[in-house]
Amino acid sequence: MSEFLQSIHYGSWILPVLLALPLVGAGILWLHGFVAERALRTGPASDDTARWVTLGTFLVMFIVSTGLWWAFDPHGGWQFEFDTAWLPQWGIRFSLALDGISIFLVLLTTFLMPIAVLSGWTSIDKRVHTYHGLFLILTTAMLGVFMARDTFLFYVMWEVVLVPMFFIIGIWGGERRMYAATKFFVYTFLGSLLMLVAILYLGLAAADPVTGRPDFSYDAILAVAQTLSSTERLWLFFAFFAAFAVKIPLFPFHTWLPDAHVEAPTEGSVDLAAILLKMGTYGLLRFSLPLFPDVVTNPAVRNVVLALAVTGVIYGALVALVQTDFKRLVAYSSVSHMGLVVLGIFALTAESLQGAMMVQLSHGLSTGALFLMIGMLYDRRHTRLFSAFGGLARVMPLYGLFLMISVMSSIAVPGTNGFIGEFLVLTGSFQTYPVLATIATVSVVLAAVFVLWALQRVLFNPLDKPENMTIPDMNWREVAMMAPIAALIFYIGLHPAPLLRRMEPRLQELIQQVDPTSVRTSSTAVPGSAGGGN
């Protein structure tokens, strides 16, 4: 496979093609919608065309992107590079590349987007062309965040994400959709403004001494950050951190998330939980740690961040326990899971960093799966309240099977994808912060309690409501959505070595940049991570 990919010069064109394909799809959708409206041919047939064009675009993207897995060299640093001038007078370039951190998030995005489209196949029946066009634009922006090697390009993509998601929630969401959409936009936009100031400051500081032209390339920003005073680096760290903390979201910046999840359509919730939240933790790994190592290792700063992370882990679990709405419960569980990711990042051990990467990938699959399952129930019963269900395992055996698999992944049952990440985060964090790691471990038990309780209320309580006795089981489309996720849940859980092997060199390099005393040999970092397999 690698030889074939080299023969077609795969690495030289794959990233710009992945960014361009959704935009081409969106253009086709809007052109088709315009022509259909002029010809007075709008209706179910026209809407189906929009759905198939979107699904086809995402399937092509996924198929093409699988080559990244085979062509990626774990020891190769930045790969699949594409660089061209964009706004040269301002030192801004259209520069793309992937490394052992970003490649997984790109693959997660291309894997989940066609599944997400299937989730709204029948439930979205108004302005279908616009709806799917917005999702295509959203996909380009999300991928751009993970691919960008120019910091200004990173910021542009970061902000573009807000616009389609605002309209998706605000137009196709629930009863309080405008409140949730506005809250989402305001929170994330205000945090991002501070990051913009920091990026401009660094780009100007890296300006060419002869021409005075700013330089926003990642390498230039990384180099100039080390020449600034400790006070400057402290303020710049917090400017970046504000944007990332809101997006993660880290406690106490999380209050926009439950409302956005509850009001968003299923497809929006899947993208929000599985991909958008990862932009925040990706930002920590890409910018906060390597640009400001002295701030990250400063005990005062580090302890505050770790305290917020562990508070979020416990808070999310406790609040989830008292929820009566299935979707809101999963939203608060996301606060808990993402707090665990931040704990792993700032514990700064080889194990905890690998665990953080694995937890965020596993969270994307498990939480995405849970939102898909909740969406199926809502399509049938138009409610998400636990009190409306009970005994569904008897009438929906397929649904019960896939919901149990999703729950097993979420609570990190051994053999599923969730286990290896949580195990590495907790064991790695225990080396440097045993008390915080112990507290976080308690939250894992709480997570099992609230998710299993939800499972009992939906599947195993008495089947005593007439509406539930005739509820149909999953159809072929819904099985097609869930089967790939279920397969990946068990594949990663039983064979995580290929993922760990691809991320380990880059994470070791990151630790070396931040805190050389934390570096350990790769043979002791993660048992089995050097193992074979693709």
Regions found by a protein language model. Name each.
Residues 32, 36, 45-50, 130-228, ...:
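Alpha-helical multi-pass transmembrane bundles of energy-transducing inner-membrane proteins
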Residues 56, 127-141, 179-196, 217-241, ...:
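Interfacial and helix-entry/exit segments of alpha-helical transmembrane bundles
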Residues 251, 451-466:
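Transmembrane alpha-helical segments of integral membrane proteins
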Residues 1-14, 29-133, 210-215, 219-223, ...:
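Transmembrane helix-loop-helix hairpins at membrane boundaries of multipass inner-membrane proteins
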Residues 2, 72-93, 193-254, 284-304, ...:
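Juxtamembrane/interfacial segments at transmembrane-helix boundaries in multi-pass membrane proteins
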Residues 11-21, 98-109, 151-164, 233-246, ...:
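Structural signature of hydrophobic alpha-helical transmembrane segments
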Residues 26-31, 66, 114-118, 140-144, ...:
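Alpha-helical transmembrane segments of multipass membrane proteins
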Residues 16-36, 55-68, 106-120, 138-140, ...:
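Central hydrophobic cores of alpha-helical transmembrane segments in multi-pass inner-membrane proteins
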